[in-house]
């Protein structure tokens, strides 16, 4: 919470240092963080939060700092921020960041096409998460899910049932 207020006040360097020294993983803090930011948004300078998050996507070497920034960007309308969307799509190709990026990309107008492109390129947990988010809206996607959806570097069983459900395998 203090870090968000530091960012809100424009104390970016101080916030970055504090973020780099945190001893937890963002996956466990995502929901409480976002709920708190939404609840306290009147006290938070969202423009500063957005500026900090976007800049860290390109400059931070700390995985959890990048995840923090991706979490923050989930609640900011980025449709017109083409450069930022491109950064998010690049980060999505790393299994480490795919889930966080999907939470941003799902808010775009062409979200399913973006998710489909990512799903085709990632192979580990990124593929598993992408399959969860991907909607089988046309034959091209359904065919890909049938032929490739289960292929991942983790465990095919993690996506098998989801793939079967999405393409309505029982009906085929």
Regions found by a protein language model. Give the residues of each.
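Short linear, low-complexity motifs centered on an aromatic residue
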Residues: 109-127
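Positions within ordered alpha-helical repeat solenoids
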Residues: 39, 59, 71-78, 90, ...
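Extended repeat-based scaffolds of very large eukaryotic assembly and lipid-transport proteins
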Residues: 1-79, 83, 91-94, 98, ...
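Buried hydrophobic core positions in alpha-solenoid tandem helical repeats
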Residues: 52-54, 85-89, 114-119, 144-146
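A generic structural motif
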Residues: 102-104, 118, 125, 157
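Short linear functional motifs in flexible/disordered or boundary regions
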Residues: 81, 100, 113-114, 157
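Alpha-solenoid helical repeat scaffolds
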Residues: 68, 87, 100-103, 129, ...
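Long, helix-rich interaction regions
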Residues: 1-10, 124-129, 133-172
